[in-house]
C-alpha cells in the first residue's frame, strides 16, 4: 500500500512476478522494503527532534502462506536493521502489524484480496498471528528502543462479530506477558 497503488500487496507482487519474472520481482520488493526506512530517514528524524517511528509491516514478512509454522528470517533481519538505526539515533520503534491472514478489514491497504475480513471467521488465522506475536517479542524482549507493538492495524468487525476483537486482544496480549 505504500506505493500508492490501490491494490492488495499480494496481487501487486503476483502481477510484478508475471511481468518481470519471480527473481526480478522478489529483488524489487526486497529493495523496496530496505529503502522504506533508511539510515538517512532516521538521521532526519533525530535532527528534527522526533523520537518515535511507527513502521507498518505485512504478516508475510515473517510468515509463508504455504507453511505458516515457518518463520521467515527476512522479517527479523528487517526489524534488526531498523532497531540498529533506532539505537544509533535514539529513536523508539513501534512495529505496526498492518495485515493479517484473511484480512482484519475489507480494504486493499490491509492486503485483503476478497473484501471480507475473513481473519475474524477463522480461528486458524488468529492462531497464526498469536503465534507470531509470541515469537517477535521473545526475540526482542530486551531491546531498549522497542517501545511496544501495534498488534493489529485498523480492525473491522461485522455487526455479528460479538466480542471477537476483545477475545483476540485478550489472547494475543496473554502471549506477550
What is the predicted role of each segment?
Residues 1-176:
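Active-site mouth of glycoside hydrolases
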Amino acid at each position: 500500500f505504500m506505493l500508492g497503488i490501490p491494490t492488495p500487496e499480494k496481487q501487486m507482487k503476483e502481477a510484478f512476478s508475471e511481468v518481470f519474472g519471480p527473481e526480478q520481482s522478489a529483488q524489487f520488493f526486497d529493495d523496496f522494503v530496505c529503502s522504506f526506512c533508511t539510515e538517512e530517514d532516521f538521521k532526519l528524524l533525530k535532527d528534527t527532534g522526533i523520537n518515535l517511528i511507527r513502521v507498518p509491516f505485512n504478516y508475510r514478512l515473517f510468515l509463508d502462506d504455504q507453511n505458516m509454522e515457518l518463520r521467515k528470517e527476512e522479517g527479523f533481519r528487517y526489524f534488526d536493521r531498523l532497531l540498529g538505526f533506532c539505537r544509533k539515533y535514539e529513536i523508539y520503534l513501534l512495529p505496526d502489524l498492518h495485515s493479517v491472514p484473511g484480512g482484519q478489514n475489507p480494504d486493499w491497504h490491509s492486503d485483503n484480496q476478497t473484501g471480507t475480513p475473513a481473519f475474524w471467521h477463522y480461528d486458524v488465522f488468529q492462531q497464526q498471528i498469536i503465534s507470531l506475536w509470541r515469537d517477535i517479542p521473545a526475540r526482542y524482549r530486551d531491546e531498549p528502543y522497542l517501545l511496544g507493538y501495534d498488534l493489529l492495524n485498523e480492525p473491522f468487525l461485522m455487526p455479528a462479530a460479538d466480542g471477537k476483537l476483545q477475545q483476540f486482544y485478550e489472547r494475543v496480549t496473554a502471549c506477550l506477558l
